[in-house]
């Protein structure tokens, strides 16, 4: 081209003619045209620009399937780039190959195809982008020609440039989302972009602030069998691999899932073929929390808040010390966690307790850090002017290996006031003469478990010490326990005061040297007794300590006449050879309800009447160390009933009863709906004690497929040996065999019914060419006729009766290239010899039948002629004259249908 001339818009008449000719030029290749204006024509401003834009839109309509307007999208779901982003228009050659997105035509002035920053990128900017406004009609435009008043020539060049743009869906495929709440939708599979992309493989990564998790709810889910949607939690951090929460077979509309971390992934795959439906998922962030810290043994924990910033404070029971941090803080993070390990409560082996007021001394457990041998020394010091009272709560020492000594003072040289080798355990306890006590425990590999719990209390010298009653309660008239105060004792259920009977109260006496006028009673679990309360407890002798051998205890439990007794076995751990027998009635002569031995789990028993008898027998003999803890039985009265408790039908299932009323012996049979399996016993029986033989079962949805099995001449690889929903089984054949059928089977769930495999199990067939059917021999036939036979298959031939087979009866297809039969097909020939007994067959048999038949016909015809022609008599023997003349052969009737002498033919078959 030469020197560019000044450009003027084309005259409106020419543009209008070109616009009218668009239907004829539609589909033709675009090319540049020079349009020269008529001399003396004026330069239109706004009207010519509008017509140019109309022309531009008409040129865009290159086919009926691509009806785009300038700067618009055909599919409303394919949004334009976000605001602020620049859509580059590259310089392209005139002939461009089709791209993967919609084609947009841009008009650039001066023939510049998007090159340089001065060229506008699009004639009409897409929504959401910023572009310079069009020039106002009133504002002067830029100079169109050289300065100096030279004659200007206007040339308009329309350049059509094919621009490949990348468009995105509202929620982009492979997109990172950081908002706290929103929606994730599947891309439109019917859009032009999706049709050209082929297989869609999209990953939506949702991440929120640390300390928050992500909760999703499936609002719409309509996927085909070929489409897959995976929900994964985690990922995005080193060492934190994503964990599968669910796949498309496990998801359902309305389902809610929570990610335990601040990141969640949605992985969607879809084939190229557009399908309806898709998915729509709502997501929102929720505040994560630390797990509840475990309670330490012999201690407890109190938590202010489980969310980040909350604290957990640990404390130990009396006699135990905390090992570790007393307070833990919930720290924020991808997964909030406590800032330390959970502490433990340990009994210390010795130590000094200053300013003692109230507390305990507990022996540590042998072994571990302290070793099998113990030497523990405690010093208990009270404040000035106070003394100490030591109460023996629980003591179990090995006579040969354990020793406990208590001294009134604070040194090993203080006077001994108790020695386990010489003294019995003081039920009243010990009182120090000074403000200190020295306690020493020695244990050398004991044969029996070591148990020691001593309760100490400091009290004023002008007052009595506070009485203590293990397994009981103490009420007093003076909480300060000054002289004159009364203390009354009562035991907890299952225990009895010892010594029994009144007085059950003691008094603080002697103002000069205050002391109690009697010893404190004790609450002990007794061996036997009569119990008539509506509810109570039966304990083994000396509970919670182990019972001693040589026990024979009988308890009688009685309630109101119209009631019966429900017995709950909470703890049962008796020695081998010991037995607890329950009698359904008053006395050991009643029917035996149950006999319990050794350790037993928790269970319930029901009497038939208002009386129940319990007998515990432990033969005398040396105790078995480590066993025989005892038992704890709770009882209460319940209404009398002659039926077992009503059991509701299971969810997703039903039950049938053998009787209308749930009386003794009634059998309940449980079944589940299709797609669910029964967890528990399917048959329950109402027992004699009106309790069911087992806990009611439940119906659980089956989430596994049946084992599809192995294949001959091949092997398989399973992603999960249990075949859960979503698992895959890959089949492969041995060398020389080819797979017929689907190579991979997928277990998918169904709304009704059990999970099912996506296809049938394939087969492994030989890779050799099949043998063609050799044909059927004349006068013979084959078994299982088909056109092709695989290598190794056999074909068998048979002949019809009267023919004999010449050749091989069975031929086999031998593998090869090509495969061949082992021999030629046989022939069927007529049998040479005939059995004499069958000589009448064929023509002889026909002659034997037709010859007698012909004789019968001849004789019958002769008799007929004889009677009718020769004798002139009727064959039927009618007699008498008639009132009409016989009709002769020459009748007056002219109708041939009534002509005499008609001929009839009879066909006789035998």
Curated annotation (Swiss-Prot):
Subcellular location: Cell membrane; Endoplasmic reticulum membrane
Record note on modification: O-glycosylated with core 1 or possibly core 8 glycans.
Positions bearing carbohydrate: 176, 222, 247, 332, 355, 373, 473, 517, 641
Disulphide bonds in the chain: 173-202, 290-330, 316-345, 349-376, 464-508, 491-523, 527-553, 644-686, 672-699, 705-747, 733-764, 771-813, 799-828
Transmembrane segments: 845-865
Topology feature Extracellular, residues: 28-844
Stretches the record annotates as O-glycosylated at one site: 41-48
Coiled coil: none
Annotated InterPro entries: CUB_dom, SEZ6_CSMD_C4BPB_Regulators, Sperma_CUB_dom_sf, Sushi/SCR/CCP_sf, Sushi_SCR_CCP_dom
One Pfam family cited in the UniProt record for this chain: Sushi
Compositionally biased spans, kind Pro residues: 123-145
Entry annotated with the keyword Metal-binding: no
GO cellular component, one term: plasma membrane
CDD domains (alphabetical): CCP (cd00033), CUB (cd00041)
Keyword entries, A-Z: Cell membrane, Disulfide bond, Endoplasmic reticulum, Glycoprotein, Membrane, Repeat, Signal, Sushi, Transmembrane, Transmembrane helix
Chain ranges of the Sushi domain: 288-347, 462-525, 642-701, 703-766, 769-830
Residue numbers spanned by region Disordered: 65-152
Induction: Increased expression in the majority of primary lung cancers and lung-cell lines tested.
Residue ranges of every copy of the CUB domain listed in the record: 173-286, 349-459, 527-638
Residue numbers on the Cytoplasmic membrane side: 866-910
Topology term for the membrane: Single-pass type I membrane protein
Biological role stated in the UniProt entry: May contribute to specialized endoplasmic reticulum functions in neurons.
Note: May serve as a prognostic marker for lung cancers.
Family, similarity comment: Belongs to the SEZ6 family.
Name under which the protein is recorded: Seizure 6-like protein 2
Species annotation: Homo sapiens
Gene: SEZ6L2
């Amino acid at each position: 081209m030469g020197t560019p001339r000044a450009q003027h818009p084309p005259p409106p008449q020419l543009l209008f003619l070109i616009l009218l000719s668009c239907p004829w030029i539609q589909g033709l290749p675009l090319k540049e045209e020079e349009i020269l204006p008529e001399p003396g024509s004026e330069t239109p401003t706004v009207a010519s620009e509008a017509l140019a834009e109309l022309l531009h839109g008409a040129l865009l309509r290159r086919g009926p399937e691509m009806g785009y307007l300038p700067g618009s999208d055909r599919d409303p779901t394919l949004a334009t780039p976000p605001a602020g982003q620049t859509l580059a228009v590259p310089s392209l050659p005139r002939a461009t190959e089709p791209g993967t997105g919609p084609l947009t035509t841009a008009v650039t002035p001066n023939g510049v195809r998007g090159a340089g920053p001065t060229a506008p990128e699009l004639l009409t900017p897409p929504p959401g982008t910023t572009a310079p406004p069009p020039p106002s009609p009133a504002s002067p435009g830029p100079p169109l020609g050289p300065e100096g008043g030279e004659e200007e020539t206007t040339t308009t060049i329309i350049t059509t440039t094919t621009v490949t743009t990348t468009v995105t869906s509202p929620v982009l495929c492979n997109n990172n989302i950081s908002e706290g709440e929103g929606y994730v939708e599947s891309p439109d599979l019917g859009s032009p972009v999706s049709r050209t992309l082929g297989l869609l493989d999209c990953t939506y990564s949702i991440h929120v602030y640390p300390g928050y998790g992500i909760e999703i709810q499936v609002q719409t889910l309509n996927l085909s069998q070929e489409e897959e949607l995976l929900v994964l939690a985690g990922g995005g951090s080193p060492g934190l691999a994503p964990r599968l929460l669910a796949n498309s077979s496990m998801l359902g509309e309305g389902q809610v899932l929570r990610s335990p971390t601040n990141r969640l992934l949605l992985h969607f795959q879809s084939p190229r073929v557009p399908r309806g439906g898709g998915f729509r998922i709502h997501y929102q962030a929720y505040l994560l929390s630390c797990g509840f810290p475990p309670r330490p043994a012999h201690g407890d924990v109190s938590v202010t808040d489980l969310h980040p910033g909350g604290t957990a404070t640990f404390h130990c029971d009396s006699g135990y010390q905390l090992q570790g941090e007393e307070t833990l803080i919930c720290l924020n993070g991808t997964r909030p966690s406590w800032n330390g390990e959970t502490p433990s409560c340990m009994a210390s082996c010795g130590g000094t307790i200053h300013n003692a007021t109230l507390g305990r001394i507990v022996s540590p457990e042998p072994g571990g850090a302290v070793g099998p041998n113990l030497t523990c020394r405690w010093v208990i010091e009270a404040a000035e002017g106070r003394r100490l009272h030591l109460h023996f709560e629980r003591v179990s020492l090995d006579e040969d290996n354990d020793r406990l000594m208590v001294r009134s003072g604070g040194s090993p040289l203080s006077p001994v006031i108790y020695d386990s080798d010489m003294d019995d355990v003081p039920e009243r306890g010990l009182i120090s003469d000074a403000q200190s006590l020295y306690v020493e425990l020695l244990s050398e590999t004991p044969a029996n478990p070591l148990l020691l719990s001593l309760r100490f209390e400091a009290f004023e010298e002008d007052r009595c010490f506070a009485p203590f009653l293990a397994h009981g309660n103490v009420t007093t008239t003076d909480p300060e326990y000054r002289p004159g105060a009364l203390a009354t004792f009562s035991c907890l259920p299952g225990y009895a005061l010892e010594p029994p009977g009144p007085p059950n109260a003691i008094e603080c006496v002697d103002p000069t040297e205050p002391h109690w006028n009697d010893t404190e009673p004790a609450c002990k679990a007794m061996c036997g007794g009569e119990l008539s309360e509506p509810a109570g407890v039966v304990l083994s002798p000396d509970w919670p300590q182990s019972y001693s051998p040589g026990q024979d205890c009988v308890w009688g439990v009685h309630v109101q006449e119209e009631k019966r007794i429900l017995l709950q076995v909470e703890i049962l751990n008796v020695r081998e050879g010991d037995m607890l027998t329950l009698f359904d009635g008053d006395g050991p002569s009643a029917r035996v309800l149950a006999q319990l031995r050794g350790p037993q789990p928790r269970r319930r028993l029901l009497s038939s009447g208002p009386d129940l008898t319990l007998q515990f027998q432990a033969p005398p003999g040396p105790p078995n160390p480590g066993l025989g803890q005892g038992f704890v039985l709770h009882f209460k009265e319940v209404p009398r009933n002659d039926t077992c408790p009503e059991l509701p039908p299971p969810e997703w299932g039903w039950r049938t009863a053998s009787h209308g009323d749930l009386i003794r012996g009634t059998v309940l049979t449980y079944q589940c709906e299709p797609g669910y399996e029964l967890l528990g016993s399917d048959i329950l029986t109402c027992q004699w004690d009106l309790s069911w033989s087992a806990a009611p079962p439940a119906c659980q949805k089956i989430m596994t497929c049946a084992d599809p099995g192995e294949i001959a001449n091949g092997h398989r690889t399973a992603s999960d040996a249990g075949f859960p929903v979503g698992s895959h089984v890959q089949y492969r054949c041995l060398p020389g065999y080819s797979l017929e059928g689907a190579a991979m089977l997928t277990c998918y769930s169904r709304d009704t019914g059990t999970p099912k495999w996506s296809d049938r199990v394939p087969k492994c067939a030989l890779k050799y060419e099949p043998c063609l059917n050799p044909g059927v021999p004349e006068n013979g036939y084959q078994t299982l006729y088909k056109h092709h036979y695989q290598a190794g298959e056999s074909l068998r031939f048979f002949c019809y009766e009267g023919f004999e087979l010449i050749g091989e009866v069975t031929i086999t297809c031998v593998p090869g290239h090509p495969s061949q039969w082992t021999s030629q097909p046989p022939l069927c020939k007529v049998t040479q010899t005939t059995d004499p007994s069958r000589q009448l067959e064929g023509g002889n048999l026909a002659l034997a039948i037709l010859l007698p038949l012909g004789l019968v016909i001849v004789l019958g015809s002769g008799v007929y002629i004889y009677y009718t022609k020769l004798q002139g008599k009727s064959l039927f023997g009618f007699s008498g004259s008639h009132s009409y003349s016989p009709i002769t052969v020459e009748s007056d009737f002219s109708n041939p249908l009534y002509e005499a002498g008609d001929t009839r033919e009879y066909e006789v078959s035998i």
